[in-house]
Amino acid sequence: MADGSELYTVESILEHRKKKGKSEFYIKWLGYDHTHNSWEPKENIVDPTLIEAFFTREAARKAEIKAKKDKMAAGKKGASSKASASVSKASASTPARGAKAAPKPPPKKSPPKRQRLAGGDIRPDSDTDEEHSSADKKSKAEDEEEVEDDEEPVPKKKKEVQEEPEEEESVEGEDEEESQEVEDLKEDEKMEEDEKEEEEDVQLESEKNEKEEEEEKVEEKKEEEEEEEEEEIQLVIVEKTVIETTIVEPAVATPEPSEPSSSEKAVVENGSSSAAAGNSASKPEVSAVEVVTVEDDDDIAIIE
């Protein structure tokens, strides 16, 4: 971050993380390249609108990703439903394996044999016999034609049996595509769950941060209240001390002067006269002194 001599400007917030219960943001600084990007605590971001703009962008980005995934999942679901419909249609058109061919009609009864006469000769055919034999031949020919008609679809069935492996291969390919789509859907669901968990973690972290901020505010308010209470207590103590240490001097009554008695007046007068006499006696009169110097050092005369 900036030191005391230089102030850095935040250009944009790139990422957000939680470290030791505190929010940190990856900052791109204005006028600096990506090599100067740094993780900074929330307190270092002066403008709170930058944080709000970052979380708004993150929410829009996640919503866009989720919408794209939902769209992809819906497309894959439609493709899988179409593939399953085509598979069911192909299976319906393909005959079941081991299907039995149409049963052949029961063979017609052969005409009765000619009867022999008593002499061992065969009875000649009558007109009715000839008609019956011709009718039998005709019916036999019709039966053979019917049998041929019944046998005509057999080669077609063989061809269908030969085409079954190709259809099986196509079905297997469709099954693989369906399994791949299912795996893709599972991966998408897993990614959505991871993103959802990440969003829940971010939300929990934001709630935790808000709770911590509220607790810090409560603690600060509590400390302020305690400081105010301490100041009030100190003020009360100071006032009490001032009251106790203040000295109140009582007023001293001055007695009124009374007139002295006659004896006291006499004593006072005598005292004043004696005091005056004493003062005069104690103060000797000073006269001029003349000092005469004599040649002899030992004799010094003082003349008044």
UniProtKB/Swiss-Prot annotation:
In this chain, composition skew of type Basic and acidic residues spans 63-73, 122-141
Region: Disordered; residue ranges are 63-235, 248-304
Q: Does the keyword ATP-binding apply?
A: no
GO MF terms here are: chromatin binding; DNA binding; methylated histone binding
| Highest taxon listed in the record's lineage | Eukaryota
Q: Output the Gene Ontology cellular-component terms.
A: nucleus; pericentric heterochromatin
State its location(s).
Nucleus; Chromosome
Q: Which UniProt keywords apply?
A: Chromosome, DNA-binding, Nucleus
GO terms for biological process, alphabetical: heterochromatin formation
Q: Gene3D superfamilies, from UniProt?
A: 2.40.50.40
- Basic residues bias spans: 106-116
Q: Where is the Chromo domain?
A: 8-66
Give residue spans, biased composition: Low complexity. Answer: 75-102, 248-292
Skewed-composition ranges (Acidic residues): 142-152, 163-204, 212-233, 293-304
List the SUPFAM superfamilies.
Answer: Chromo domain-like
Q: Where would you say this protein principally sits, based on its record?
A: nucleus
Report what the protein is called: Chromo domain-containing protein cec-1
